[in-house]
Regions:
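Short beta-strand and adjoining strand-loop segment in the mid-core
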Residues: 1, 39-47, 62
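A generic structural signal for short beta-strands and their flanking turns/coil linkers
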Residues: 13, 37-39
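Solvent-exposed alpha-helices and their adjacent loops that cap or buttress functional pockets
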Residues: 32-36
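ADP-ribose/adenylate-binding Rossmann-like module
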Residues: 1-30
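An accessory alpha-helical subdomain
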Residues: 47-129
């Protein structure tokens, strides 16, 4: 009953409220988060079963490594170069799709950031594959 009163008071005062164990009394939910550098993945069950969000977060923590975070940093640099040097929107989209692919990440993992940058620059300057 106290939680409901607090929630109702918050609603009247236009203050966001989160009653963790009562999803119907939540204006927002706090997701479980996996963060690897600038890569951030948020998982939520909208308050229905936070334990499952936590379980999924643990699985994703094993799947996504710090290498993924470093890859995002390199993608950001490549994206800036593409935006500065490639005037055609369709070509920019295609290049970004190529560079953000699984194959590109595998190349990054196998050869390292410096080689990947060279590989990315060749794609940016050359014809689409």
């Amino acid at each position: 009953e106290l939680n409901r009163r607090i929630y109702e008071d918050c609603q009247e005062l236009e203050i966001l409220c989160n009653v963790v164990d009562q999803p119907q009394l939540c204006d927002f939910f706090v997701p479980a988060v996996v963060k690897r550098g600038n890569l951030q993945i948020a998982i939520s069950t909208e308050g229905q079963c936070p334990a499952y969000s936590g379980h999924l977060r643990q699985k994703l923590e094993e799947l996504f490594t710090e290498t993924h975070g470093r890859f995002v940093d390199e993608l950001a640099k490549a994206r800036s170069r593409i935006l500065e040097t490639v005037p055609d929107g369709d070509r920019r989209k295609a290049l970004l799709g190529q560079l953000a692919s699984d194959e590109s990440f595998e190349y990054f993992t196998a050869h390292g950031p410096e080689q990947w940058r060279h590989h990315a620059d060749n794609q940016i300057q050359g014809p689409l594959l």
